[in-house]
């Protein structure tokens, strides 16, 4: 094994903590690791359907808590005792693939065309797909209409640009007891996701289609500068807050504006907030509304001896009809594919519209050789600017240079 491969495998193993090892999957079963504490009713029904049609390959699900799920999957794969198929963050696929731990899951052109823009790209590198998208998350802009009104702003008019967002945040901070804007900058993966939303609302990129690191660009400098400029009008000490903690402040009406998933709609209503939702404000180079496009995927692991049948099972679970049933049952997942049923859902619940509108000009979560390394570099960059330890240009240059080792 060469040095670079040992290093990356060590990085993968470091993710795994002290999770115990399980035995190799038996040939007659399809072992699947799902994250959470319950098998959803939709999956229970689909497993029963599969078992009836494929009695020689019954499904054996294993539930692992969200905090340990990725770690256990990684531990089993690195140890050479892989599960057949597992729920993973798509950001890990490149690292798994380069270490020969998973197999490609090719998509036909017809399959690719069935998804929203860029969804296949979240699982693709070197021209191959390495996972099957199974969950999709996008973000939109939420605001507290009552706090807008208290600050002298039109409660029905959200900011459309970064410039307006900062001006509104300043006006709210100066005229109410609330912070203007909710900023996420804690040492947590959500900080990376959150800044990527800024990159993708200004036509920026981290790594291009040819595998070049392009973080140090005018578009991303504008994003990091706008990020810095809104700090004075955000909650105090943003490096102490991750997204759920910022959401809690918003729900307590301690801040007026934040970027959030669709979950903020129901939570806001339950909290009695007079809220609105719109596409994320955009930067000067934006071509339209954008957002980070995050997917989780089903990865098929190498070495089980039944990879082809497992791929068939994964595609059964995520067929358009079955995937839509899963998404609608979960309630907080952005649909992976457009359909008449999705159109009907948006017509019934118009607050979904911004979460779909941002897809067209959004961008996928970057696939790098060491996602933890990437995450650490990005968090350090963001925090150095938020705290004033570095200026945006210097922080961007430093981060771009450090990312070269992970491309």
Give the location of each predicted region.
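A structural signal for short loop-to-beta-strand junctions that line the ligand-binding cleft
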Residues: 83-84, 112-147, 179, 287-289, ...
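Extracytoplasmic/periplasmic solute-binding protein
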Residues: 130-134, 139, 164-212, 255
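Conserved C-terminal helix/tail region of periplasmic/extracytoplasmic solute-binding proteins
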Residues: 52-53, 58, 149-150, 155, ...
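Short, solvent-exposed loop/beta-turn-alpha elements that line the ligand-binding surface or hinge
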Residues: 103-117, 158, 181-185, 202-222, ...
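Extracytoplasmic "Venus flytrap"/periplasmic binding protein-like
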Residues: 46-118, 124, 150-152, 249, ...
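C-terminal lobe and pocket-closing loops
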Residues: 41, 94, 262-276, 283-380, ...
